Amino acid sequence: MQTYLVGGAVRDYLLGLPVKDRDWVVVGADAQTMLAQGFQPVGKDFPVFLHPETHEEYALARTERKTAKGYVGFSFHADKDVTLEQDLMRRDLTINAMAQDADGKIIDPFGGQRDLAAGILRHVSPAFAEDPVRILRTARFAARYKFEIAEETIKLMRQMVENGEADALVAERVWQEFAKGLMEKNPRKMIEVLRECGALKVLLPEVNALFGVPQRADYHPEIDSGIHTLMTLQRAADMGLSLPERYAALLHDLGKAKTPSDILPRHHGHDLAGVEPVRKVNQRLRAPKHCAELAELVCRWHIIFHQVGQLKSQTILNVLKKTDAFRRPERFQTALNVCIADTQGRLNREHTPYPQRAHWLALLEAANQADSGKIAAECRSQGKAHLIAEQIDRARLAQIAPLQKAFRAAQDKTEKH
């Protein structure tokens, strides 16, 4: 019985990165051997055990065989006769198919170290094509390390998409990998890889449809709506924004793919037009509620947020109410964060100031100065309960108006200079 450190732990060690999780493979043992040594069985689908002291996962070396379409159609063989190389061969990428023995020696039968040094993601064997989740995983690793994908691997990924393997992916697995990819350092790279292999058209056709749609060059020097979306997503990542914010950044401009061709490159009404596509994506991916809600909110309101300097006080109050800013100020703030990424996610506009965010938050704070409880009590005491909402609005407007007037005056002064 021999144990080896495998997979991501070896990869990250060789990259000089912190090793977070350690997985082990056991060669020359069976389930009875593991149980006799005090290991606890935990694997439902595979023979995986917890170490009695460290509680790290130890899996018996195994081989796998495809039995049906999709990512669940596998049978496996785990026994004493399965070698380390056979176990490593079933893994997805060469950089994940290395092991380290007890003496620290690296076992690398498929050239993982070479590909790490070259910054290449390469599949281990044709068995890569048996699991469509690997398309997403490969795109995610590209986003993490900014590695390029080997020509033969991207070709295989294209074939998998053409053969309908991506259609077999269930929403939960797609979201699981997709969410991880969005939180990587270079999420733009994940979307680019998915587009290159054709999977984006299957998994997120609404995003794929943005590529090739022109925008006004004076507002968007990058021209292409798809490129702007990638830049906005990457800006959100560079800002260190959360998963819901990055997800909203990706979907904020879906309405641009709906713009009638006769008005291009203008996109009047794309904020409203994008709401339905955002809802479709949310439903297809079964996105968590907090992600889905923010994505829809940003899509619907980002243009209004940008144009705050042009709004009347009454319109501002209406926006604060319709976006539920009074009850959910944190969500309102995250939506404004995405608007910064949108503004700066343009060619050579990466450092454009966005005073609108601070102004919206100041407007909300000012409106909250109106004492709703006191107003409600006074109305009730005067037998005018039906006027409560109207009086609260009036008090909020009184707080908003001078702030908005000052902001517009400052804007006018800036424009003149």
Curated annotation (Swiss-Prot):
Q: What region holds the HD domain?
A: 225-326
* Catalytic activity reported: a tRNA precursor + 2 CTP + ATP = a tRNA with a 3' CCA end + 3 diphosphate; a tRNA with a 3' CCA end + 2 CTP + ATP = a tRNA with a 3' CCACCA end + 3 diphosphate
Where does the source fall among the domains of life?
A: Bacteria
**UniProt keyword annotations, A-Z:** ATP-binding, Hydrolase, Magnesium, Metal-binding, Multifunctional enzyme, Nickel, Nucleotide-binding, Nucleotidyltransferase, RNA repair, RNA-binding, Transferase, tRNA processing
Q: Which residues bind Mg(2+)?
A: 21, 23
Q: What binding details are noted for the cofactor?
A: Magnesium is required for nucleotidyltransferase activity. Nickel for phosphatase activity.
Q: Which GO terms describe its biological process?
A: RNA repair; tRNA 3'-terminal CCA addition
Tell me its cofactors.
Mg(2+); Ni(2+)
Q: What is its EC number?
A: 2.7.7.72, 3.1.3.-, 3.1.4.-
Residues in the signal sequence = none
- GO MF annotations for this entry? ATP binding; CCA tRNA nucleotidyltransferase activity; cyclic-nucleotide phosphodiesterase activity; magnesium ion binding; phosphatase activity; tRNA binding
Which residues participate in ATP binding? Answer: 8, 11, 91, 137, 140
Oligomeric state and interaction partners are given as: Monomer. Can also form homodimers and oligomers.
- Family (UniProt): Belongs to the tRNA nucleotidyltransferase/poly(A) polymerase family. Bacterial CCA-adding enzyme type 1 subfamily.
Q: In the UniProt entry for this protein, what further remark is given in the free-text comments?
A: A single active site specifically recognizes both ATP and CTP and is responsible for their addition.
Give the protein's biological function. Answer: Catalyzes the addition and repair of the essential 3'-terminal CCA sequence in tRNAs without using a nucleic acid template. Adds these three nucleotides in the order of C, C, and A to the tRNA nucleotide-73, using CTP and ATP as substrates and producing inorganic pyrophosphate. tRNA 3'-terminal CCA addition is required both for tRNA processing and repair. Also involved in tRNA surveillance by mediating tandem CCA addition to generate a CCACCA at the 3' terminus of unstable tRNAs. While stable tRNAs receive only 3'-terminal CCA, unstable tRNAs are marked with CCACCA and rapidly degraded.
Protein's UniProt name: Multifunctional CCA protein
Species assigned in the record:
Neisseria meningitidis serogroup A / serotype 4A (strain DSM 15465 / Z2491)
Q: Quote the gene name from the UniProt entry.
A: cca
